[in-house]
Curated annotation (Swiss-Prot):
Name of the protein: Aspartate--tRNA(Asp/Asn) ligase
Species this chain originates from: Magnetococcus marinus (strain ATCC BAA-1437 / JCM 17883 / MC-1)
Reactions catalysed according to its record: tRNA(Asx) + L-aspartate + ATP = L-aspartyl-tRNA(Asx) + AMP + diphosphate
GO biological process: aspartyl-tRNA aminoacylation
Function: Aspartyl-tRNA synthetase with relaxed tRNA specificity since it is able to aspartylate not only its cognate tRNA(Asp) but also tRNA(Asn). Reaction proceeds in two steps: L-aspartate is first activated by ATP to form Asp-AMP and then transferred to the acceptor end of tRNA(Asp/Asn).
UniProt GO cellular component terms: cytoplasm
Length: 607
């Protein structure tokens, strides 16, 4: 007989019915000759009972059952007695008395029990077992629901799902490409796509108006908890749109996914702040809006300070983020922190380049010598008054200061703000705090390379009010350097993590060539790498823009997990290896010869 029910679907309404169940032995217990088995499939558990008095043959077979054996059990649904009801199981009010048992497969003894706390490496080595865990099955089923919600919503909004090539040409997008050698074209290589960026733009030029794809992308970069060498994007592009159109559409997709998968209502419209505001108030371009603390800028008032550290930072000149900055972060109630705790936070900001962490404990008004700190004696009344007005500090508060290059101050105090907010439990009640960050700079100055780089990618459109600065012969006026040119780019941030990013694209050939020129990509290189795009732009390209949502990150945050590896079926380690399949691996010399390749790698010999 074929399966009639999933394990977790059997309920009191089926009492008296005969059902056929299939699944794995989760647990087996022998109580006075009666054998109880928790049978598991992807939906959950149900208790099946083998009674020697009622059905001797299946009971005899049940003596051979062990963990993870695969069985088919046919039996009658019966109500459990009052004393045996299990309120912790969905099926805890019933059990199935087995009349017929088929053992479909046996199992070797497990290297670990599925409910054991084990190392991640062991989990990844035996991923096929780890995926049987209820929490992993929940995670992947949840991911499935998100994907189906997105597809349904975008299809209903007039989007066309189009697949783009996995084998394409190498183009610079900020990270290293994964390269694939061509056997048919010796010496040439494909690249696995870092994103479908150029193809989706070409689809807009081809007139498809609204495109989407749930797509695999590849980046050969150093990994951390929220990154993988291959990852999944919810990718979309729209024609004849402005930033607001893309952001509103994206909000509707995300809001629907939260509602369907979590039953959570996300307030709309999502708050919007500019990049400049994010950096000024929070120090990071992906601020965690659950934390109400803000940074305050003291640079101007500290330019004449007697405190050398503040004065030097306030008067430091430099291009881009190399100019000086002095900021303060008020920690409400932080005056209770011990010196040891403050030293720990000082070490923490050192990770981000800060040379120290000045502080003031507010024990009373500054006019009454109520501020406790080694730096107070260097501060004049005007500076103290400015600090008080900026922070509105109260008795019991703690003030942390950053003084250095803007890049160091923003990063260190921005990260400290998040750390303090979480460790001191200063998060607001909003569990999912979304924010749009808009008007990113178009370009960033690389001080080491002495050249401009694209903040997002070379195809991002500049803000229409700032295009004039790109068109100047020298690239920009003295009063308005290129780093101040804004872009029509926008990021969606959730709880301090970027979950999506996009922009309006350049649809004018001359402007696109100018952008490449500013990035020091010459005509020959531009033609070689982007010639197909530049040609397409000349044949009636519409205004267009889009966005990509990181599916792995989004699901991780929705489930409150720490690592995206827990929402991916077969992830890689932080060394980009698969412990289960042992990929990457050596290949046969004949395969390399076919590809006209040979390895020059020489392993280190033991000394």
């Amino acid at each position: 007989m074929k399966r009639t029910h999933y394990c977790n679907d059997v309920r009191e309404s089926q009492i008296g019915e005969t059902v056929v169940l299939e699944g794995w032995i989760n647990r087996r217990r022998d109580h006075g000759g009666v054998i109880f088995v928790d049978l598991r499939d992807r939906t959950g558990l149900v208790q099946v009972v083998f009674s020697p008095e009622l059905f001797a043959e299946p009971h005899a077979q049940a003596h051979t059952l062990r963990s993870e054996y695969v069985i088919r059990a046919t039996g009658k649904v019966t109500a459990r007695s009052e004393g045996t009801i299990n309120p912790n199981m969905d099926t805890g009010r019933i059990e199935v008395v087995v009349e017929d048992l088929t053992i479909l497969n046996s199992s070797l003894p497990l290297p670990f029990q599925l409910d054991d706390e084990i190392s991640e490496n062991l989990r990844l080595q035996y991923r096929f077992l780890d995926l049987r865990r209820p929490d992993m099955q929940r995670n992947l089923m949840f991911r499935h629901r998100i994907m189906q919600s997105v597809r349904k919503h975008l299809d209903g909004s007039g989007f066309v799902e189009v697949e783009t090539p996995m084998l394409t040409r190498s183009t610079p997008e900020g990270a290293r490409d994964y390269l694939v050698p061509s056997r048919v074209n010796p010496g040439d290589f494909y690249a696995l796509p870092q994103s479908p960026q150029l193809f989706k733009q070409l689809l807009m030029m081809a007139g498809y108006d609204r495109y989407f794809q749930i797509v695999r992308c590849f980046r050969d970069e150093d990994l951390r908890a929220d990154r993988q060498p291959e990852f999944t994007q919810i990718d979309l592009e729209m024609s004849f749109v402005e930033p607001n159109d893309v952001m509103e559409l994206t909000e509707s997709v995300v809001v629907e996914a939260f509602k369907e998968a979590l039953g959570v209502s996300i307030p709309q419209p999502v708050r919007r702040i500019t990049y400049a505001e994010a950096m000024d108030k929070y120090g990071l371009d992906a601020p965690d809006m659950r934390i109400t603390m803000e940074l305050k800028d003291l640079t101007e008032v500290m330019k004449s300070s007697e405190f050398k550290v503040f004065r030097q930072a306030a008067t430091l000149e430099g291009r881009g983020n190399e100019h000086g900055l002095v900021k303060v972060l008020k920690v409400p109630g932080g005056g209770s922190l011990t010196r040891k705790q403050i030293d720990t936070y000082t070490e923490f900001v050192g990770i981000y380049g800060a040379k120290g962490l000045a502080y003031i404990k507010v024990n009373g008004p500054w006019q009454e010598d109520g501020w406790q700190s080694p730096i107070v004696k260097f501060l004049g009344d005007a500076e103290k008054q400015a600090i008080q007005e900026a922070t509105q500090a109260q008795v019991g508060d703690l003030l942390f200061f950053g003084a250095d290059k803007a890049s160091v101050v923003n990063e260190s105090l921005g990260r400290l703000r998040v750390k303090l907010g979480k460790e001191l439990e200063m998060l607001c009640d909003e569990k999912f705090a979304f924010v749009w960050v808009t008007d990113f700079p178009l370009l960033d100055w690389d001080n080491e390379a002495r050249r401009n780089t694209a903040v997002h990618h070379p195809f991002t459109a500049p803000h229409p009010d700032d295009i004039i600065y790109l068109e100047n012969a020298d690239g920009a006026s003295v009063e308005h350097p290129l780093e101040k040119v804004r872009s029509l780019a926008y990021d969606l941030v959730l709880n301090g993590t970027e979950v999506g990013g996009g922009s309006i694209r350049i649809h004018d050939t001359m402007l696109q060539r100018r952008m490449l020129e500013l990035l020091e990509i010459g005509e020959e290189e531009a033609e070689g790498k982007f010639g197909f795009l530049l040609r397409a732009l000349q044949y009636g390209a519409p205004p267009h823009g889009g966005l990509a949502l990181g599916l792995d990150r989004l699901v991780t945050l929705m489930l409150g997990l720490d690592s995206i590896r827990d929402v991916i079926a077969f992830p890689k380690t932080q060394k980009a290896t698969c412990l289960m399949t042992e990929a990457p691996s050596k290949v046969d010399g004949a395969q390399l010869k076919e590809l006209h390749l040979r390895s020059t790698f020489k392993p280190k010999t033991a000394e």
